[in-house]
Amino acid sequence: MINRQLSRLLLCSILGSTTLISGCALVRKDSAPHQQLKPEQIKLADDIHLASSGWPQAQWWKQLNDPQLDALIQRTLSGSHTLAEAKLREEKAQSQADLLDAGSQLQVAALGMLNRQRVSANGFLSPYAMDAPALGMDGPYYTEATVGLFAGLDLDLWGVHRSAVTAAIGAHNAALAETAAVELSLTTGVAQLYYSMQASYQMLDLLEQTRDVIDYAVKAHQSKVAHGLEAQVPFHGARAQILAVDKQIAAVKGQITETRESLRALIGAGASDMPEIKPVALPRVQTGIPATLSYELLARRPDLQAMRWYVQASLDQVDSARALFYPSFDIKAFFGLDSIHLDTLFKKTSRQFNFIPGLKLPLFDGGRLNANLEGTRAASNMMIERYNQSVLNAVRDVAVNGTRLQTLNDEREMQAERVEATRFTQRAAEAAYQRGLTSRLQATEARLPVLAEEMSLLMLDSRRVIQSIQLMKSLGSGYQAAPVVEKK
């Protein structure tokens, strides 16, 4: 007897093992994941030589010591609709991860049901259609009642749901990094617009000084014409100059208005609550990039962090797609009361218990699982290639912005010498006028070349400030990867 039972148990074990092995669908084609760029490949070309400096600090704008800029950025971070949208994407990604995680947990539900029915005299339950109280049948009408608890659990032995949850958590981490990228874009955008506006204020001041000089020349030539001391050609030439300057002044004023409106939209200000922006001097620019990039650039660029998390999530999705080829197991159970008579529903004899283990074997699916795996793998490899290109683009941004800033610094040094040279000429003209060697008009007009060179210097300074902010942005502007969100 015992040997027979052991034989049956052995036979069941062999059949069960054979069923599990044969129950796995065949993976016809699955390519290897594409390679990601190695950190040692993340470096600048050998012929790019820039001053060495540390990484930007968090809240980098505070180092500029500009209260107006501080207030604008704080208002942007607290009231930007773009940033609010990014934070809502965080919440959406979190809820998606929670939803998938909840689906892999034990599910328990209370069940209550009433079923008023008439039993067919010709069906499978035809005996219950009789009206025979002695036999416990008072058909053909019955009111069946069921109350109890229903539970279900997917055992997820191969990690179908587990990998899907991990992928969703990766997408949530990516959303966190994307929010940081939005903050970075907003802060640098506000700073660039703010200093563009400050440069326009200074340009307007230089143009108005230029206009004053030319206006004096117009009046001087007009007086000479009125006294018959010279022809009208110099007078009309000066008039043409002043009209050209007026045109430039109008253009700069329009540029200030456009910049202000762009800034208004970025900080989320309304038509009547835009803060007044007073003129201040442009800040001094610090030139330089870190000595090495490598891992640090990956960790300090929020867009690269987001891409890295999307790559990891795509690999987890591939794992989930592969796990679908294996048998799945689940357990369902019911415990409660069931009776075809309401008056006996809550009696001890109405208790019912069901225990239903389930097994699903993916034998024939018409290629659905392979197509799903192939598509998921292709999407993952696409994400890896996009990530690799993003890393290369990030290195390019650092190299290009750093080189441009260094070039602007060199140009600024030469332009500063030109300004000093024209100032020397102006001082010489002033000295000659003081000694009575030249007229006051000539001494005054000697100021025009100085103003022209100062405008060129101002444009270089403005471009340097904007470029330095762009370089900080390409270096992450003080971003540090946030702590990883893990499964609760």
Swiss-Prot record:
A GO cellular component entry from the record: cell outer membrane
Signal peptide limits: 1-23
UniProt superkingdom: Bacteria
Record-level Gene Ontology MF annotations: efflux transmembrane transporter activity
Localization per Swiss-Prot or TrEMBL: Cell outer membrane
Assigned keywords, A-Z: Antibiotic resistance, Cell outer membrane, Lipoprotein, Membrane, Palmitate, Signal, Transmembrane, Transmembrane beta strand
Lipid attachment residues per UniProt (S-diacylglycerol cysteine): C24
Lipoprotein is among the record's keywords: yes
Pfam families: OEP
Alphabetized PROSITE patterns for the sequence: PROKAR_LIPOPROTEIN (PS51257)
BP GO annotations: response to antibiotic
N-palmitoyl cysteine: lipidated positions: C24
Family to which the UniProt record says this protein belongs: Belongs to the outer membrane factor (OMF) (TC 1.B.17) family.
Function field: Could be involved in resistance to puromycin, acriflavine and tetraphenylarsonium chloride.
Assembly description: Could be part of a tripartite efflux system composed of MdtN, MdtO and MdtP.
Protein name as it appears in the record: Multidrug resistance outer membrane protein MdtP
Upper taxonomic lineage: Bacteria, Pseudomonadati, Pseudomonadota, Gammaproteobacteria, Enterobacterales
The encoding gene: mdtP
